[in-house]
Amino acid sequence: MQPRKTPDLGCRNIDLSPIHASLKEIHAKYRDDFSGNVATYIPELAKADPSLFGVALVTADGQVYEIGDANHLFTMQSISKPFVYGFALEDHGVDHVLSKVGVEPSGEAFNSIVLDERHNRPFNPMVNAGAIATTALIKGKGHDQRLARLLGKFSDLAGRSLEIDHGVYISERATGHRNRAIGYLELNFGMIEEPVNEHLDLYFEQCSILVSARDLAVMAATLANNGINPLTGQCALDERYVQNVLSIMHSCGMYDYAGEWSYRIGLPAKSGVGGGILAVLPGQFGVGTFSAPLDDQGNSWRGIRVCEELSERFKLHMLKSRSAAGVVVRCSYRGNAMRSKRRRSSSEDEILNRRGATICVFELQGTLFFGTMERVLRRITEEMATFSYLILDLKRVLQADECSAALLSQTAAMLNQQQKILLLTHCPEHFGNSGETINHERFADIDCALEWCEDQLLQQEQPEWLRGGRQIPLPAMDILQGFDPSEIALIETILLEKRYHAGQIIIREGDSA
């Protein structure tokens, strides 16, 4: 098997990302929960280790987050069905495929022999009858060429070369009597054509393809990215049919749990009895999970819990209204390139020119939700090693949901652990509408925040007599630089000392000189 090639997106501190931390927290919550039972109707599946548990999330632009046993290999099983449906659409187009396989939920078990007698076709491509009919549509000259096409297409989706677990394939082939009955029943009614045994072998083989939770997340991210694999940049599925695939996943992808899944979690998804679940948030990311113990509906028990937590925590329901992501970081710069309006002495200027780059400013814009915040957090973790103070300006942020407030609060805590300070400007007391208070440095605008950061840097380097509001000796004043001691002493005799209380106005712009 070829090694995976993940693009270098520059995020060197991925473990510090609040998104990675959230995935880690969710994984830890269910790691020791062994509810459910491993599938046993296929002998090879019964050998699965119930303790293995992996979670991966891949964004539509290729950032990979993975936790636990995310690289453990298992067989796709029914997760292969929506993709083969997409391949059939590429081969024949929508109208022809619809004439052979419907798109309506059946209300029956995934291995039901019940067919749509009115239209003389299986109800949908997610039940076994529909999946067998879909596989029968895959073009190629003979079994070997058709199998090579399927493996090649799945490898394009995963961004690496995939293989078949021949032990599982042989086990499925030896025990797949019900599927054989379905195949020959479909042949009898003219739903599929010969060679039936070849179609069935291909179906058993596609279900036996080895993948990991990470692979599933990449495949899901490919669907989220309109069919373009975000790791390789290769088109793995024609963009015209991505919507069709996601639609059938949304309505029929989770067996008898499909309706409740749509109601509670709201993401197009597909599960398999091998323990995998794949879920997609179009335009944003894909999720892959693996845990072999299944619930009563045949879905991974831990996988369902992970997706529920992610959807609730990050407000991911597909029907939740949100604006397009766009560019969220309007501009960024450092404190040595953009200074506050506060006038400084030449010695202070020298310090700030030298150390000002440790002040980092991000001006944000648009709508903040999971997809846009992930990009902001990635930028933060990429640059974190080079700054001590981070200013996030929210002046141009139009809307922010609860997820963005929670992620920002976690970011502040993470930066604090790294001995760095987060400053927010133009930020409401309660960020978003969640009531989650982000208890960190707040300022009215960027200039005030820059001045505060500059003061911190100056306090770290200035002489002791400049700290704590102490009086500056005359020789240290910029205006007297170049004068010798006798001249300074003479000037001191003619100066008049005046004292002002804190907050007292010394001079106003426009006053007479």
Q: What kind of feature is each model-predicted range?
A:
Residues 317-413, 417, 423-427:
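The feature marks cytosolic C-terminal regulatory regions of anion transporters and related permeases
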Residues 81, 503, 511-513:
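Glycine- and acidic-residue-biased ligand/ion/polar-headgroup-sensing regions
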Residues 3-7, 12, 226-257, 262-333:
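Structured C-terminal helix/loop/strand segments within mature extracytoplasmic catalytic/sensor domains
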Residues 61-62, 75-97, 219, 287:
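Active-site SXXK
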Residues 31-67, 276-279:
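A short, well-structured edge-of-sheet supersecondary motif
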Residues 19, 451-509:
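Cyclic nucleotide-binding regulatory module and flanking cytosolic helices
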Residues 439-448, 452:
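Short acidic-hydrophobic, aromatic-tinged amphipathic segments that line or gate anion-handling sites
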Residues 3-35, 88-206, 222:
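Active-site-adjacent helix/loop patches that line small-molecule binding or acyl-intermediate pockets
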